[in-house]
Amino acid sequence: MATVAMINKAKATPKYATRRYNRCGVCGRPRGYMRRFQLCRLCFRKLASEGQIPGVTKSSW
């Protein structure tokens, strides 16, 4: 879990725009980020399996 200080640091506007990075909106995780949902892969999987993300279905082949 990300610390509060790291989440606040990511929210602040940096001196240069290229230094900005994405974090999960739920847990603050910086890796495995899915831009379309603004979630990390772990939170996305949990919320999708609970049916809380509309339009997302489990696929099998």
UniProtKB/Swiss-Prot annotation:
Keyword RNA-binding assigned: yes
One term of GO molecular function: zinc ion binding
InterPro entries for this protein: Ribosomal_uS14 (IPR001209), Ribosomal_uS14_bact (IPR023053), Ribosomal_uS14_CS (IPR018271), Ribosomal_uS14_sf (IPR043140)
Annotated source species: Treponema pallidum (strain Nichols)
Keywords recorded for this protein, A-Z: Metal-binding, Ribonucleoprotein, Ribosomal protein, RNA-binding, rRNA-binding, Zinc
Database matches in PANTHER family: 30S RIBOSOMAL PROTEIN S14 (PTHR19836), SMALL RIBOSOMAL SUBUNIT PROTEIN US14M (PTHR19836:SF19)
Name of this protein: Small ribosomal subunit protein uS14
Binding positions (Zn(2+)): 24, 27, 40, 43
Gene3D superfamilies associated with the record: 30s Ribosomal Protein S14, Chain N
Name of a matching Pfam family: Ribosomal_S14
Cofactor note: Binds 1 zinc ion per subunit.
Cofactors required: Zn(2+)
Function: Binds 16S rRNA, required for the assembly of 30S particles and may also be responsible for determining the conformation of the 16S rRNA at the A site.
